[in-house]
Amino acid sequence: MMTCVALAQENHSYRFSLEDCLHFAVANSYERKSMELTGKSLETTYEQSKQQRLPNLSASVGQNFSNNENGWSTSGSVGVGSSVTIYQGGNINNTIEQNRLNLERNEVQLERYDNQLATQILQSFLTVLGNQELLNYQLEVLNTSREQLKQGQSRHKVGAILESDLLLLEAQYYSDSNNVVDTRINIENNLLDLKVLLSMNPTDDLEIISPDTDNLDGLKESLPTEEEAISLAMEYMPDLRMSDYDIRLAEKSVDMARGNYFPSVSANANLGMGVLAFDGDGNSNWYGKPTESVGVSMSIPIYSRGQTKANVKKSRIALEQAQLDYEQSVLSVRQTVVQAYRDVVSAFNAYKVSQVKENAYSKSFNAYNIQYQYGTITTVELLQQQNNYLNVLNSYIQNKYSLVMKRKILDIYMGKEISL
């Protein structure tokens, strides 16, 4: 009989700032945990490789049974042996160093993953913020549209406006209502995307804490010069440090390949002796004397059918490739940072322009709304101004959060802590 048990996962509620999101993601990311396990494995390999400098030690025990014309007899032996590699072309030290570099490279790779994850979370978080701010404006516009429709219905009853004007007001109200619904759906989808990045249960409740974004002039004031930004990024960017580790690992591979040209020297020591034996008549005696041996052996490579030479050549080619990759990484980092820096400058200018336009169109829309109440402008003129205001508002919110995102991405490149 099979019993099926349904495990209901408990839902949680979270109220997170951007910093909270970053900390939660680092603690719960399955991919990051997998990379940490890889690091533990590399650390184990490194620690074990250091033990290769030490001699090994083994023991042996043997017991024999034989049957002859006198009956059964037994005999046995015990022994202890040890060996140690004295010299192997430097490959023991090279292997240790190679394993250490692999371990450190994995730590830098983990930093790069954290940066990539932080960038994705930042983008998703700001998308939620932008849509939430847009929703607040849309709700204000919807309330205005509702009042306009009520006034229009009253004025239509007394013949102050045409039916076509009333229909335009109704259409605008339902259009604004639909915008609110669409934005709310977008926010829910944005939050779901953010939960995925946080490795959070999709059914958990997540509320984000909105920072103060009314004045973003400080983002420009704290901006370093372009050369300073490049210099900071060149020191911090994990991509460059990983490329540097790749060069050092390739150099060790060359050393290890060249080590096969040299002889290897090892030493060994053994101690053995016989044990008590019984013959078929029940007599016992010790037999044999303890045997001791100490030896040193040397293996000298003479001819390997060109294998060692080929391995050295291929390792040097790999080193040259690693050096080329590093130079390419340097160029890519410089290009990326320069582009990111100029994107920030451009985004700030776009934000300031859209900020001025939003303020102007907001006041203009309010003025048009008052004029419409007194009947000095037509319905078409009012709705045209309202739609112009909505377009400018959308552009303002997009430029606002685009500036924040681009500025914070530049901070990530420069190795600065991310906060809003």
Where are these regions (language model features)?
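Bacterial Sec-pathway N-terminal export signals of envelope proteins
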Residues: L7-S58, P202, I208-R248, I418
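Membrane-embedded beta-strand positions of outer-membrane beta-barrel proteins
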Residues: M35, L57-V61, N99, S243, ...
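Periplasmic alpha-helical coiled-coil/stalk elements that build and connect Gram-negative outer-membrane
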Residues: Q116-L232, D343, A347, Y389
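A glycine-/polar-enriched beta->alpha junction
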Residues: H23-K33, K40-P55, V80-Q98, V108-N115, ...
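Small/polar, glycine/serine/threonine/aspartate-rich low-complexity segments that form flexible
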Residues: Q9-Y14, S60-Q88, T95-E97, P211-S222, ...
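Amphipathic alpha-helical coiled-coil segments
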Residues: L22, S34-S49, Y113, L117-Y137, ...
